[in-house]
Design a protein with these regions (language model features):
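Acidic/glycine-rich phosphate/pyrophosphate-binding loops and surrounding catalytic core
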Residues: 1-147
Length: 147
C-alpha cells in the first residue's frame, strides 16, 4: 500500500473526468433544476466493500462548486456493509447532480480494486503466499489503483 494520496495524485484526473462527463455543460440539470435549489445526497453501498476513493469523490463535488459540504461515514480502507451510508454531501442541487456520476465512478472503481484485493489477501492468509501489486495498471491511474 502506498502512503496517503496527495491532491497532486488525483486532482488532474478528477478535472479531466469532469470535463469529459460534463462537456459543454449539464443541459438537463440547468434546464430542470432551479439555480437556488439546495439538496442533500447519500452515497450507499450496494454490496459489502472496502472503501476507497473518498478524496476523489469529494474533490469532484468541490471542483463543481466549493459550497458543497460533506460528511464521511466510511473512510478509505474501512469495511462497509450492504446498504451502509458511505458519505453524505449537501449543497447546490445543480452541483450535486453535475458531479455525482464522476464521484460514483471513482468510488466504484477504486472500492472494487480494494475489495477484490482484500478477498485475495484473505484467500491466501496462513499459506505463506503474499499478494503483491503490479505495474499493469490503468493508464493515468497507477497511484490510485496501487493505493
Amino acid at each position: 500500500m502506498l502512503e496517503a494520496l496527495k491532491p497532486d495524485d488525483y486532482l488532474p484526473l478528477v478535472k479531466a473526468a469532469l470535463a469529459e462527463d460534463i462537456g459543454s455543460g449539464d443541459a438537463t440539470t440547468l434546464a430542470l433544476v432551479p439555480g437556488d435549489s439546495f439538496a442533500m445526497a447519500v452515497m450507499v453501498a450496494r454490496d459489502p466493500l472496502v472503501m476507497a476513493g473518498v478524496d476523489l469523490a469529494l474533490a469532484a463535488f468541490q471542483e463543481v462548486d466549493e459550497r458543497v459540504e460533506f460528511g464521511i461515514e466510511i473512510f478509505d480502507g474501512q469495511l462497509g456493509g450492504l446498504g451502509q451510508a458511505l458519505l453524505r454531501v449537501q449543497g447546490p442541487t445543480r452541483a450535486l447532480l453535475t458531479a455525482e456520476r464522476t464521484a460514483l465512478n471513482f468510488v466504484q472503481r477504486l472500492a472494487g480494486v480494494a475489495t477484490l484485493t482484500a478477498r485475495f489477501v484473505e484467500q491466501v492468509a496462513g499459506t505463506g503466499a503474499e499478494i503483491l501489486d503490479t505495474r499493469k495498471t490503468t493508464p493515468g491511474w497507477r497511484a490510485l489503483e496501487k493505493y
